[in-house]
Amino acid sequence: PGAAKNQLITFKGKSVSGALANQTGTISIPKGKPPKGGWPVFSWAHGTTGIADACAPSAAKLPKGEALLPKLLKAGYAVVRADYEGLGSAGEHPYLNGPSEGRSVLDIVRAARKTNRSIGKTLLMGGHSQGGHAALWAAKLAPSYAPELKLKGTAVFAPASHIGDQASLVRNLDTPAFSPIVGLILRGADIAAPALGVESLLSDAGKAAYPETLTNCIGNLTSWSTLAANAILAPDANVQSLVDYLNANDPEDLSVKTPVLVLQGTTDTTVLPIFTTQLLSKFKQNRVPVTGNAYKGLNHGTVVSSAKPLADAASFLRKRT
């Protein structure tokens, strides 16, 4: 809403294998005349939707969790949203593979600039949950992968991190609350790194539920929503190689040179505040120019839809344009 023009595009992006592959996404151009140098562009990385093609955000209406985007569009930013590799396009989505997601967030900016000469080189980025993970990877990759772009800052809401730590704890969880996400994490790792042999790690119940990760979106993984997390893996499964893979894709050790704002709700039970605190601590140790804001009483959904964090993110981005 509020755009002079909205486009659904197919563009070439670098896949998890390193080959070029078609990907999809959207471009929104502000109303009015672009400033000298072109519209600054904001690349938004979406949160978890699923792995099936039907879960691609470009196929749906703008969700409540993307309330920041119309605000930035009205303020004079071109807004782009990548669906990520394998969502809404050929191939499968390597969920939470950092390099794949990060490149998608940058590749759509390149594609947008080729098709819309009014878009300039000034880049800002943001994301929520999986998208926070993706945007942080994009911030790390930008100087070497897309040096023609001028990245000014990245704002992330409840960014996914410490997935390896959480995978190690699956056997201790006797409820199904996290099981749908666990299913997607397993499938994403399997797609990105088949040599891990993920399916061989599953229990009979896990194997029975596993195909659903390729067909259903996050809100409809019914087999997983009734499967206790500690029943997903086989009793004798050795998950160390899987944990090593997940740790290699964690954003915690990324070297990011441009400013980062991390916004976290204190009552989030999906991306736990303790993990975001650890992420911030490691960033500061590594001299990442990061600011962390905690929002009392906000959870995983409300942190990206409530007035205060939205205003703080918009202010952070505007100051760096």
Where do the model's predicted regions map?
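Short substrate-entry loop that stabilizes the transition state in hydrolases
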Residues: G18, K33-W39, W44-R81, E85-G91, ...
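Alpha/beta-hydrolase active-site loop
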Residues: Y95-N116
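Short beta-strand/loop motif that positions the catalytic acidic residue
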Residues: V256, L261-D268
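Acidic catalytic loop of the alpha/beta-hydrolase fold
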Residues: I163, T266-V271
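N-terminal cap/lid segment of alpha/beta-hydrolase-fold proteins
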Residues: P1-G37, V41
